[in-house]
Amino acid sequence: MKVFRRAWRHRVALGLGGLAFCGTTLLYLARCASEGETPSASGAARPRAKAFLAVLVASAPRAVERRTAVRSTWLAPERRGGPEDVWARFAVGTGGLGSEERRALELEQAQHGDLLLLPALRDAYENLTAKVLAMLTWLDERVDFEFVLKADDDSFARLDAILVDLRAREPARRRRLYWGFFSGRGRVKPGGRWREAAWQLCDYYLPYALGGGYVLSADLVHYLRLSREYLRAWHSEDVSLGTWLAPVDVQREHDPRFDTEYKSRGCNNQYLVTHKQSPEDMLEKQQMLLHEGRLCKHEVQLRLSYVYDWSAPPSQCCQRKEGVP
């Protein structure tokens, strides 16, 4: 009876405590629901985005001008084909940003809705490999796609021509695809921005598609996501990707139409991706495509190209010669 009398005497405090406990529990449950997948009315998981070709553009927090140029040229709605042809995001690391930079990105996201913000990652060259792996992991978890084009925000891509090429492929040529402009004779850099102090495999990098733009099939992206905890990251994301896929049974397709080296080889109407383009270069190419149906006002070759010789050792793979785009 004493217990009941004490409980009655403190009934108000106990009641308030119970309400607080219930409120805390409800808030916790609401938070859990918001952090997980939201089920649909049928109890199934929320539908994933769908696209034949996903496009992930690596961009820096302050590169607004470049993103604007890409949005108004090769990633403009009229360049994306039909429904569910192309899905695109600009990937930006936001770790360590100040409040003003974060606010600017939030406003840009509110306006365009095409940013993939990575809060756990500080956007810097030394983190580029981790960034690309995070981009691909996010994509595999949230989008149903067949292929992904990874590009830089200073690259210009012909999505129409890329879509035509991919759709024309037989099923066997769509699986485990690693498509771009390959290098097999890249010497390990001992210093400078591209220094790889931890590289111990050999005196050359393993064959890799240059990072200005390349295409991967969805099955390889899925493999990378599942393996990510075991993958060693080097400074260069393209070198890292080539190394990660070296022991895998993939279809490596070297294509000179990917002008994706550290500087452009010029302008050729056959090019699918052209790297190292200024916003002005992109606008000029877009206008040429709209009014002339071709990429270049005048074709020009600034550097020789090559066809990769897969029958030769990697160090002898890539002999530049006339007549190759």
From Swiss-Prot:
It catalyses: 3-O-(beta-D-galactosyl-(1->4)-beta-D-xylosyl)-L-seryl-[protein] + UDP-alpha-D-galactose = 3-O-(beta-D-galactosyl-(1->3)-beta-D-galactosyl-(1->4)-beta-D-xylosyl)-L-seryl-[protein] + UDP + H(+). The chain crosses the membrane at residues 12-30. Its EC number is 2.4.1.134. Residues 31-325 are lumenal. Pathway: Glycan metabolism; chondroitin sulfate biosynthesis; Glycan metabolism; heparan sulfate biosynthesis. Coiled coil: none annotated. GO terms for molecular function: galactosylxylosylprotein 3-beta-galactosyltransferase activity. Glycans are attached at N127. One of its GO terms (cellular component) is Golgi cisterna membrane. GO terms for biological process: chondroitin sulfate proteoglycan biosynthetic process; dermatan sulfate proteoglycan biosynthetic process; glycosaminoglycan biosynthetic process; heparan sulfate proteoglycan biosynthetic process; protein glycosylation; proteoglycan biosynthetic process. Its main location: Golgi. Its cofactor is Mn(2+). InterPro entries: Glyco_trans_31. Residues 1-11 are cytoplasmic. It is found in: Golgi apparatus, Golgi stack membrane. It is an enzyme of class 2 (transferase). It is a single-pass type II membrane protein. Keywords: Glycoprotein, Glycosyltransferase, Golgi apparatus, Manganese, Membrane, Signal-anchor, Transferase, Transmembrane, Transmembrane helix. Beta-1,3-galactosyltransferase that transfers galactose from UDP-galactose to substrates with a terminal beta-linked galactose residue. Has a preference for galactose-beta-1,4-xylose that is found in the linker region of glycosaminoglycans, such as heparan sulfate and chondroitin sulfate. Has no activity towards substrates with terminal glucosamine or galactosamine residues. Belongs to the glycosyltransferase 31 family. This is Beta-1,3-galactosyltransferase 6. It comes from Mus musculus. The lineage of its organism: Eukaryota, Metazoa, Chordata, Craniata, Vertebrata.
